[in-house]
């Protein structure tokens, strides 16, 4: 996959929201479902987009929420946005999405990308996706982006 094209695809995720991420039900590819919005004055309708990271040989997910916020965010009443008690002062997990800020970036070639490229005979890339709750690092070969139909739900 051409790195300039890949970088452009990743740049288009800036400041949108991740609503789901995980391996597909067949366990080879990793999908990141994004809710993309624009200023209503543009006339661009919101859309759910599937970023399918193909041949994903490594996926790491780590929290971006600091420990001191975690400490005050353990209460289960923070799991539902509608009923979360603002007086608890913790992170409201129930928002059901994570803001992509600063977003996704293509990382420089690494030992891991070189090793997998050599082993499989295809190019590999590494991307870092930063949100306000989780940071993802994915090692993959190709990226496909598609708009999702209304009612799409990831397989479980």
Q: Residues of each region from the PLM?
A:
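Surface-exposed, interaction-prone regions used to assemble/regulate multi-protein complexes
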Residues: 1-156
